[in-house]
Amino acid sequence: MATTATRFPQFSQDLASDPTTRRLWYGIATAHDFETHDGMTEERLYQKLFATHFGHLAIIFLWASGNVFHIAWQGNYEQWVANPTGVTPIAHAIWDPQFGKAAVEAFTQPGGGGPVNAAYSGLYYWFNTIGLRTNGDLYAGAIGLLLLAAVFLFAGWLHLQPRFRPSLSWFKNAEARLNHHLAGLFGVSSLAWAGHLVHVAIPESRGQHVGWDNFLTTLPHPAGLKPFFTLNWGVYAQNPDTANHVWGTAEGAGTAILTFLGGFNPNTQSLWLTDMAHHHLAIAVIFIVAGHMYRTNWGIGHSIREILGAHNPPKGTPFGGLLGEGHRGLYDTVNNSLHFQLALALACLGVVTSLVAQHMYALNPYVFMSMDHTTEAALYTHHQYIAGFLMVGAFAHGAIFLVRDYDPEANKNNVLARVLDHKEAIISHLSWVSLFLGFHTLGLYVHNDVMQAFGTPEKQILIEPVFAQFIQASHGKMIYGMDVLLSNPDSIASTAWPNYGNVWLPGWLQAINDPNGFLFLPIGPGDFLVHHAIALGLHTTTLILVKGALDARGSKLMPDKKDFGYSFPCDGPGRGGTCDISAWDAFYLAMFWMLNTIGWVTFYWHWKHLGIWSGNTAQFNENSTYLMGWLRDYLWANSAQLINGYNPYGMNNLAVWAWMFLFGHLVWATGFMFLISWRGYWQELIETLVWAHERTPLANLIRWKDKPVALSIVQGRLVGLAHFTVGYVLTYAAFVIASTASLSG
């Protein structure tokens, strides 16, 4: 093993001995790239990563505890529970010695108590839904989370000790890990959550307090466990809450605990709590069964290696003979590559996070939250951006897998090798789809702008999204008059067995046709255009990422690319022909496309909902069909309140968002300085600054040992991208929150 370096970074003797500031930048950049550290073995790599998972969980629990604690300490939770639609939830108090009298007044809510920050996280709604009612409940939760964080920190430390370090074979035992994750993590946690909803949340929603003092003695259902053991489970669905049920009281409450109602509670405008308990119980059963499917020590169940080996349709069947070796070789390829596993996990989590954004408002699970428009907008935007980062990360680690871990011999002629073999077809198809979407969508928008500008708006090209309307109608939306499937009571979807036994959720049709609901919003020509603009963004981002990954090992222009590693700069033909970019450069380009695409997604969602919330849907419908409409009637019009947060006449409670809006723009613009200027400029700038520093009295008392050198090209791009990203998100966050909050008071 190499001798440990005596100064930062201790994990790299090579970097630690570098006489320039490169030591610091590269040290920070590679601190988490454990694979490249001195003396790293595969077993130590897995052990270190395993321990970091515990540290990561500890940080998450600590952060969550802080949120809960500050709401209990400085929030207004108990007052809010008494009037959830009339009181603004408080995240925490603000103490700032620079606040003048006007600022103190602006950020103090009616009733006094000093300046506070409004909560747009949705936590209040979650607490209320799951049965927490007092600050004491919140303090107990915060302390519980702190204790959990301590347990996880200890577990992380423990698993680094020689006696408790798992072996490499333990980490490579895929079947056991899959069983544990399916049954132990997903299954049992879903069962526990169903238990909490049934034993605590549902009784609290009906005005019956359940706490640590009585939860073991309070029956959640009058019939107890008798229906469970006599297989008379339908009893638990009988007598659900009525449409007149008043949240938190016995008025209009039923006794059911596991229902299949569908739709929303009209009082809270959220999913029925008893439906959600049923859902989690069903998920628990499915996952606990799934967690017993794979073969471990007992010689029963599936072997994933055997399944993958046999996963190849024989000749004469559909796709027969078209997959080569099929999935042979994939078991070891996936099981021996952490990057492959991480790429799969990030892709799945990215999709799930985007679905959460969508479902959290359309099928709102939290009581009264759909009436808090700012929180709805903040949560949608937050989850869509996170989904974007996760998806780009999935492709990045997929590319690193291909550079570092892919073994062509072990994957001969299997599906993975065949994807690489016909990458030209994949890339060219994505390319023409992107070109088609881009030119046609932009062409329609620009045509419509010209018609508006020339005074002939009736000549706009407006296309009804008939296929999307058909899909909405088939799910039961009546507004289009299409009479298809669920929107036609005589269709086979409505009458086929066993639907006469009322298998369709009875509340679904009412919910999807509620003019004030958010399920399957009515769509028209503006939606058609922006859907295709978003499709352009998604396909172009995918094109860049897929090309970057599939060309990561080599390409026509640069067949030996894998020998250069994952990240090298595209710097023109003068530096040895790195024109054909590295996978890192593809990731870098894709980040801009991802951010812009999610910009369009959130612009669309926000503008459409502002119209619904304000009762003026015509503005979106009429002005979203041309570009000036988006710039003028969405961005400019909704910035008006925001940029008047402070002006020559004073300030109001939007001032902090106005300041953040400006600050976000400045951070974003700073990024361009790094993105546009190349390396020579930075080196000259640094030399000049060092020269001035060394000749300035007092300043020249401070010296540094490392010789200052400019950032590398890749580092300059990274710094530029970081500023662009952070500034972009800060700017839009301030815009969404301030514009929505100003409209909804």
Curated annotation (Swiss-Prot):
MF GO annotations: 4 iron, 4 sulfur cluster binding; chlorophyll binding; electron transfer activity; magnesium ion binding; oxidoreductase activity
Presence of the UniProt keyword DNA repair in the record: no
Class in the EC hierarchy, top level: oxidoreductase
EC number, as in UniProt: 1.97.1.12
A GO BP entry: photosynthesis
Binding site for phylloquinone: 682
Main location: membrane
Any one GO cellular component localisation term in the record: plasma membrane-derived thylakoid membrane
Coiled-coil regions listed in the entry: none
Transmembrane segments: 49-72, 138-161, 178-202, 276-294, 338-361, 377-403, 425-447, 528-546, 586-607, 654-676, 718-738
Substrates-to-products reaction catalysed: reduced [plastocyanin] + hnu + oxidized [2Fe-2S]-[ferredoxin] = oxidized [plastocyanin] + reduced [2Fe-2S]-[ferredoxin]
Positions that bind [4Fe-4S] cluster: 570, 579
InterPro entries: PSI_PsaA/B (IPR001280), PSI_PsaA/B_CS (IPR020586), PSI_PsaA/B_sf (IPR036408), PSI_PsaB (IPR006244)
Subunit comment: The PsaA/B heterodimer binds the P700 chlorophyll special pair and subsequent electron acceptors. PSI consists of a core antenna complex that captures photons, and an electron transfer chain that converts photonic excitation into a charge separation. The cyanobacterial PSI reaction center is composed of one copy each of PsaA,B,C,D,E,F,I,J,K,L,M and X, and forms trimeric complexes.
PANTHER family reported for this sequence: OUTER MEMBRANE PROTEIN, OMPA-RELATED, PHOTOSYSTEM I P700 CHLOROPHYLL A APOPROTEIN A1-RELATED
Role noted for this protein: PsaA and PsaB bind P700, the primary electron donor of photosystem I (PSI), as well as the electron acceptors A0, A1 and FX. PSI is a plastocyanin/cytochrome c6-ferredoxin oxidoreductase, converting photonic excitation into a charge separation, which transfers an electron from the donor P700 chlorophyll pair to the spectroscopically characterized acceptors A0, A1, FX, FA and FB in turn. Oxidized P700 is reduced on the lumenal side of the thylakoid membrane by plastocyanin or cytochrome c6.
Family that this chain belongs to: Belongs to the PsaA/PsaB family.
Listed name of the protein: Photosystem I P700 chlorophyll a apoprotein A2
